[in-house]
Design a protein with these regions (language model features):
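Active-site loop-to-helix "anion-binding N-cap" substructures in soluble metabolic enzymes
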Residues: 1-248, 255, 260-270, 274-330
Length: 330
């Protein structure tokens, strides 16, 4: 066991015996340790299939808040692990790879955001869940793409609002609520890649297809959509729609669950503008593998920690989001 190397790499580097039945071993370890595995829709199919629960950011936070497991393994990105730890300070929260960050969270450094908030003292601060715990600590209420519109609408029209860090989501929420929120200039590197040209091209090939777009995409892309929604909302639309073809502009991991729930339907991922990369896949999300998940459960590392003072402040806007969401039936 080379802990020094693990710390340097950000994950357990021990090689896994290739003859092991990894799924069976992961199952054994989670039962022995009373652990729950939570997986985001943007994880690889094999991670989603072994998770106890798969969902979007809101659902994962809700599940973490109510679990009676002793250990939460968050198969997603680092801020999701932080959110779980803030909600469950007495539980052990693990992530398979500390390097699984988030370009959107990185676009909003806590010090810079706190300064921005201080410069606008008469504003309510609404932060997207894709932020660090330190950013949440200077926030009044957290939102996800599932509940952002409804939570923004719960404030009086005259209330000034700072919304961060995703400018595209902020622009979309401004348009559907007729607001002029002050927006932080951040973005998701995956959703920024989707272009009007690629969707128009696919629409020619599949003229009857519904276009499904995540609100983190640019406004011009969202205008082409038959449905703009969170990953959970897009999945629900696909399940309930009579259509057979769907052009999907979000991280391609969601296609796994769409195809599982609707095997008779055709889901076409929108390719990124840059054809030299697989940029409709989040490279951070894909850092998590079955091997890393197995080692994480085996050694109970990497473990997520959050500074106690930050956690004390960050839990308030997260709890507020969960309470509002429950009242709204989300």
């Amino acid at each position: 066991m080379n802990k020094e190397e693990w710390l340097k790499k950000g994950y357990v580097t021990e090689s896994v015996d290739k003859t092991l039945d990894l799924k069976a071993e992961i199952d054994r370890l989670r039962k022995e340790k009373n652990a729950i595995i939570l997986g985001h829709y943007y994880q690889s199919g094999e991670i989603q299939d072994i998770a106890d629960f798969v969902g979007d950011s809101l659902a994962l936070a809700q599940w973490a808040a109510k679990t009676d497991a002793d250990i939460i393994v968050m198969c997603g990105v680092h801020f999701m692990g932080e959110t779980a730890k803030v909600l469950c300070p007495n539980k052990k929260v693990l992530v398979p790879d500390f390097n699984a960050g988030c370009s959107l969270a990185d676009s909003c450094p806590a010090d810079a955001f706190a300064k921005f908030v201080k410069e606008h003292p008469d504003h309510t601060v609404i932060s997207y869940v894709n932020t660090t715990a330190a950013v949440k600590a200077v926030t009044d209420v957290v939102v996800t793409s599932t509940n952002a519109k409804q939570i923004v609408e719960s404030f009086p029209k005259e209330q000034k609002i700072i919304f961060g860090p995703d400018r595209n989501l902020g622009i979309y929420i401004n348009s559907v609520t007729n607001r002029e929120m002050l927006l932080w200039n951040g973005a998701c590197h995956v959703h920024e890649q989707f272009s009007v040209a690629k969707i128009v091209e696919l629409k020619k090939q599949y003229p009857d297809a519904d276009v499904l777009v995540h609100p983190e995409c640019k406004g011009a892309v969202a205008k082409l959509a038959d449905k703009v929604a969170s990953t959970a909302g897009l999945l629900k639309h696909a399940v309930n729609s009579p259509k057979k073809d769907f052009i999907v502009a979000t991280e391609s991991g969601i296609l796994h669950e769409m195809r599982k729930q609707c095997p008779e339907k055709n889901f076409i991922p929108v390719p990124p503008e840059d054809s030299t990369c697989s940029c409709n896949e989040c490279n951070y999300m894909r850092l998590n593998t079955l091997e890393k998940l197995y080692n994480t459960l085996k050694y109970e590392w990497p473990e997520v920690t959050v500074d106690a003072e930050i956690a004390k402040e960050a839990v308030k806007p997260i709890q507020r989001m969960l309470e509002i969401s429950e009242k709204l039936g989300l």
